Amino acid sequence: METIFKHFLLIVSAFCFAGTVAGQNPTIDPVAVFTNSESEQTELRPGESYSGSAPLTVEFSANPQDADGWTATYEWRFYTEGNTQQPYLIRYEENTNFTFTSAGTHLVACYAVFKRGDERIEYTEEYWTTEAQPIQISISESNLEMPNAFAPNGDPRSSIYKAKKNYKSIVEFHAIIINRWGQKLYEWDDPAGGWDGTFHGNPVAEGTYFVIVNAKGADGKVFKIRKDVNLLRGYREPASTTNP
């Protein structure tokens, strides 16, 4: 029996191990694909890294090459940085996906074993640990702030009441707008969403309203926000200027 060992590492911080085998022996070229914070599709391969906000959904592919006629098995192992001996998740698929919701650096490893008759080719950790190039995905600590005023006048900069743009790694979110009598006017479950200053499609009067937010970050931090919201009609945010 011929056995050839290889090892592939990929990290988000996820591990999947990479290498090449001479000739037409099957290989894997692991890749992680996701949409970054700028809404751009991003690919990571061994030796590359990414830092961003949760929740982050990543598609993993073992991407086998020259594998026709071979029977393959795959194992994706997910670790946290500093704990590479004990994966917190194992997936037995050629392609898989995972949503990262915990702050910190995650490591993901992809193992593959190819069999054809008496031949066996393994891409495992044992023989290529020194050449493993982790793809690292680091999830930031959480942050969430809500503004105290907005002006629903059609100006896209201020017409929707929503979380400030600096929010990060919010994995649970629920917000409610109420009036001074405690009547619920609007609620939403995504920090990217918000209130347009209407109730049942009709604009509400200028004045003071209240927002109640319950949220949780990827780092376990709990946010309980209660504050006034000043709705200003007829106000337009001044255009930004650049000093000469």
PLM regions: where:
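Bacterial Sec-dependent N-terminal signal peptides
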Residues: 1-28
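Sec-dependent signal peptide cleavage junction
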Residues: 20-55, 237-244
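Short loop/turn motifs at secondary-structure boundaries
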Residues: 49-50, 54-61, 103, 134-244
